[in-house]
Curated annotation (Swiss-Prot):
Compartments in which it is found: Golgi apparatus membrane
Keywords from the named record: Glycoprotein, Glycosyltransferase, Golgi apparatus, Membrane, Signal-anchor, Transferase, Transmembrane, Transmembrane helix
GO cellular component assignments: Golgi membrane
Transmembrane segments: 7-26
Functional pathway: Protein modification; protein glycosylation
Disruption phenotype: Mutant mice are born at the expected Mendelian rate and have normal developmental and reproductive potential. They develop an abnormal corneal ultrastructure characterized by a lack of keratan sulfate proteoglycans that appears to be compensated by increased amount of elongated, branched electron dense chondroitin sulfate/dermatan sulfate proteoglycan filaments.
Primary gene name: B3gnt7
One family name in Pfam for this protein: Galactosyl_T
Protein name: UDP-GlcNAc:betaGal beta-1,3-N-acetylglucosaminyltransferase 7
Organism in which the protein naturally occurs: Mus musculus
Primary subcellular site in the record, as a coarse category: Golgi
Amino acid sequence: MSLWKKTLYKSVCLALALLVAVTVFQRSVTPGQFLQDPLPPTPGPAKTGNLVNPNSFWKSSKDVAAPTPTVPRGPQVWDVITTNCSININLTHQPWFQSLEPHFRQFLAYRHCRYFPMLLNHPEKCAGDVYMLVVVKSVITQHDRREVIRQTWGHEWESAGLGRGAVRTLFLLGTASKQEERTHYQQLLAYEDRLYADILQWDFLDSFFNLTLKEIHFLKWLDIYCPNVPFVFKGDDDVFVNPTNLLEFLSDRQPQENLFVGDVLKHARPIRKKDNKYYIPAVMYGKATYPPYAGGGGFLMSGSLARQLHHACDTLELFPIDDVFLGMCLEVLGVKPTGHEGFKTFGISRVRSSRMNKEPCFYRAMLVVHKLLPAELLAMWDLVHSNLTCSVKFQVL
């Protein structure tokens, strides 16, 4: 039976099991066991301190990274246990604030709320010898994407080869954005996590602007529970990843390097058109360009740099575009992200209808390709791992 048929069968079985689970949970569990009262429009406990307001492919030449500075350890457990976030009253009466769109007013009014309690945690993922942590941003409703990733590129390895340790996978989630659906989806997620034990979840709403929260929460979690992991791959739940190529790329890399590799955008300008998803008002960011940043659903970094990023990000005000925010954090450290042709932000070809975007020989050579639907990912994974004969060998290592 082919992989996609097996996955379809498993998904059907899991769906039936979830329906049964919901019935059981609804009879035996109160909603409060999984969620606190609904959060304010946007997130968490206030962060104190002085914050800065920021107004051949694979083996190609690489920068020699400076030695990683010593970073003091933070708390040894997740130390945020309550949600106590109130609106920033000082902003609400400012004329410039009132002129903004509602979602920007909400973001700014609660931007000081940085960290939230954990609902699901798996520190055991970093027990033993772990070489690379694969971390996937997801949302509570996208079970099908998580299931396909577990069956394909997110499958865990006990050894990365060449004497290296294990490869472990985690999914990062907030809570359901619609209050009326929250209890239902939380019960389903609890059941999913009992099956797979691979979900990190925090008590903030999953939304586009809260993706930045997901970044800083993971960096804090990594610093607490996984401080010695050599490398981290972080991606979205709609990308194709070739883990074999990732590991080959890392084969001559050192964990002490300030490594941050992806599809890097340089001299990107803030978008000022209000109908664009990535629109940013000038009052929120007045500079002509963003710092260099890696976009497009996936990047690779050393664990030592991730720890530095955690502390660097804590010196900045939150920014609503997560990729750009990480670029700002890198700028604080004086680290420039490295561009790599094996990371494809907009598909292998920017022309969506191009045959190249459906050519498995290209996917076999890449590290990360964005973006694919679950069925497309399954089909491409099967093709790439079949007895595929390519007329031209693409050298990307």
